[in-house]
UniProtKB/Swiss-Prot annotation:
HAMAP family in the record: Ribosomal_uL4_B
Any one cellular-component term (Gene Ontology): ribosome
Listed GO MF terms: rRNA binding; structural constituent of ribosome
Superkingdom: Bacteria
Source organism phylogeny: Bacteria, Bacillati, Cyanobacteriota, Cyanophyceae, Synechococcales
Positions with biased composition (Basic residues): 60-71
Record-stated family: Belongs to the universal ribosomal protein uL4 family.
Keywords per UniProt: Ribonucleoprotein, Ribosomal protein, RNA-binding, rRNA-binding
Subunit record text: Part of the 50S ribosomal subunit.
Name of the protein in question: Large ribosomal subunit protein uL4
Gene responsible for this protein: rplD
Keyword match RNA-binding: yes
Primary role: One of the primary rRNA binding proteins, this protein initially binds near the 5'-end of the 23S rRNA. It is important during the early stages of 50S assembly. It makes multiple contacts with different domains of the 23S rRNA in the assembled 50S subunit and ribosome. Forms part of the polypeptide exit tunnel.
Alphabetized PANTHER family for the sequence: 50S RIBOSOMAL PROTEIN L4, LARGE RIBOSOMAL SUBUNIT PROTEIN UL4C
SUPFAM superfamilies tied to this protein: Ribosomal protein L4
Length: 211
């Protein structure tokens, strides 16, 4: 079980919150999270790269020149891989890069990653509730009040992000906003700082704390 300080929108301490999630053993935790990240990155690949073999390249049916008597090496087609414009030898073809990982392992890796970053977590009451209109400056000022260093990669996790908050955040290159039920290992490990809404903490405990 881990304890976190809850802060209000002004950055002042407003209480305590706890998070109790089952994590992997220390001896297997790094390998488990590594496999989860590899799987996530592999699933993000389109796998649509494709080249033509010599049999698929248009043309090349006619023999370029006669077999003998020219003094040159014999050629049977202008689409041989040895010539510019010819086919590609062992080139890429459409494929899937998906890696298998069972659900129990995926959830364990996610919980382990979150608990490993618990010291970088800031819990905020009613994140962005006072915003009446989208304003990026309000978000950057709030992050500063919460102790997030300027230029840091920040992951904001909310239960149901409002449209105002989404539009306020989307212009910040190093700030990413996701829903509490859409957590993933890569984002948790990639960010320098994690900002969680107080209600998101309860959602995380509910969604990921059953195992």
């Amino acid at each position: 079980m881990a304890s976190c300080v809850v802060r209000d929108w002004q950055g002042k301490e407003a209480g305590k919150a706890t998070l109790d999630l089952k994590v992997a053993k220390e001896t297997t935790a790094v390998d488990l999270m590594h496999r989860a990240v590899l799987r996530q990155q592999a699933h993000a690949r389109q796998g649509t790269a494709s080249t033509l073999t010599r049999s698929e390249v248009r043309g090349g049916g006619r023999k370029p020149y006669k077999q003998k008597g020219t003094g040159r090496a014999r050629q049977g087609s202008i689409r041989t891989p040895l010539k510019p414009g010819g086919g590609i030898i062992f080139g890429p073809k459409p494929r899937t890069y998906n890696l298998a990982m069972n659900r129990k392992e995926r959830r364990l890796a996610l919980r382990t990653a979150l608990m490993a970053r618990i010291d970088d977590v800031t819990v905020v009451q009613d994140f962005g509730a006072s915003l009446e209109a989208p304003k990026t400056r309000e978000i950057t000022d709030a992050l500063g009040r919460l102790g997030v260093a300027a230029g840091s990669k920040v992951l904001i996790v909310l239960t149901n992000p409002s449209d105002v908050v989404r539009r306020s955040v989307r212009n910040l290159e190093k700030v990413k906003l996701i829903s509490a039920d859409q957590l993933n290992v890569f984002d948790l490990l990639h960010a320098n700082a994690l900002v969680l809404g107080e209600e998101a903490l309860a959602t995380i405990q509910e969604v990921y704390g059953d195992d």
